[in-house]
Amino acid sequence: MTEDNIAPITSVKVVTDKCTYKDNELLTKYSYENAVVTKTASGRFDVTPTVQDYVFKLDLKKPEKLGIMLIGLGGNNGSTLVASVLANKHNVEFQTKEGVKQPNYFGSMTQCSTLKLGIDAEGNDVYAPFNSLLPMVSPNDFVVSGWDINNADLYEAMQRSQVLEYDLQQRLKAKMSLVKPLPSIYYPDFIAANQDERANNCINLDEKGNVTTRGKWTHLQRIRRDIQNFKEENALDKVIVLWTANTERYVEVSPGVNDTMENLLQSIKNDHEEIAPSTIFAAASILEGVPYINGSPQNTFVPGLVQLAEHEGTFIAGDDLKSGQTKLKSVLAQFLVDAGIKPVSIASYNHLGNNDGYNLSAPKQFRSKEISKSSVIDDIIASNDILYNDKLGKKVDHCIVIKYMKPVGDSKVAMDEYYSELMLGGHNRISIHNVCEDSLLATPLIIDLLVMTEFCTRVSYKKVDPVKEDAGKFENFYPVLTFLSYWLKAPLTRPGFHPVNGLNKQRTALENFLRLLIGLPSQNELRFEERLL
């Protein structure tokens, strides 16, 4: 930090000449080091280190309030999110069988985790809260609205979800009753038929009150107006839209339908049968310049929609929240492979009794979830051609089962077995039984996705020209926000790039991203203070 500039009041101050604070902006010089690798015919790796200098710019002025619009506002996740914000904002304590509880955001990485800053004078690690390094919006400042195909207010939705303690529900009743979802879009072919009984709050009704899939462009325009009205009525500068509604079936990606931006928009106008409700919401958000996050496993981001985001410069992220079984899998599978142990089969079984499980009991919707859950180990397998190759086999037998069991409600039961090959024909079996309250794991992830998406909207960068230091203009990130992969089962990537699923790699990327912005080097564990004389 230069002496003639004063840093904003934060918990962390870095003494460095890499950072300059000016007019509510933080400018940081950063040298990105990597290595380009080629493999010769003889099997030798030729490695060439590379360096590219950048200047990053962060707008230090976070919004006083952030608009959040959820598709599926009246579902388990939506009602739990609103309840958590209200409970924390108003400090609503409540009784449980274990005594009085204070509200918190446990399970949220941005609110309740720490990261290593460095060491103290004795060589001990020093940690700071994740959200203390740079200004981040607080979930207490969320202004939440959204859409749902069911018209229940959020107190009714909270009761129906059976997620929160009874006393907390009663203490939040007055405030939750005031929140009512906007009418949503319901195309019956895309979700399970058993959801039809809930669909009493839809914009796509004909003159006789029957659901119609005609007029999809009109539906898109309606969603755009909803976003505009929400911003205006609440005096919001920023809004983020997130899908936490039912899992849809996969859509067919077809030339002339959804393969390009132009074809996609025309297909919406033509009421094409492969235009799903999530496509309408995503396109409307992108056209409004509002970031859109897909929290479910369906393939909303067809090529035409990604092109639209590129054209409009609007952030998108997906797919599917990574909360329990899959998050553990992304850690355990990486551990086994990095240890030189070869997983040969992974069997994953779930049963749950909430509406998510009810919808997933239909084969087409289950297939969407199966695809997102199974892809989590792909890059981990590809990272080790000693264990996985043409001779030994390149695949892991990976089975996923999800069953609906109404009595267990939101307490999802997950059972996994990892069967691995050891040296000299030996085998290892790891069996895991995990019971988690699904929505209380998923809701903090939604909070993190929203906080970090807003943060990324305030970051820009430019490459440093070695000849003309002031050349170039600041650019935003590429529209697909892969920095958010930590919270997503099947991370959407830039076309031509492969997703990173390993949880530790994803967390490291986030930590180093924050560190570079405040002028700290990337994290390492060399610990020379101890290991060298």
From Swiss-Prot:
GO terms for molecular function: inositol-3-phosphate synthase activity. Keywords: Cytoplasm, Inositol biosynthesis, Isomerase, Lipid biosynthesis, Lipid metabolism, NAD, Phospholipid biosynthesis, Phospholipid metabolism, Phosphoprotein. This is Inositol-3-phosphate synthase. It is found in: Cytoplasm. Optimum pH is 7.2-7.7. Disruption phenotype: Inositol auxotrophy. Transmembrane segments: none annotated. Induction: Induced by valproate. Repressed by inositol.
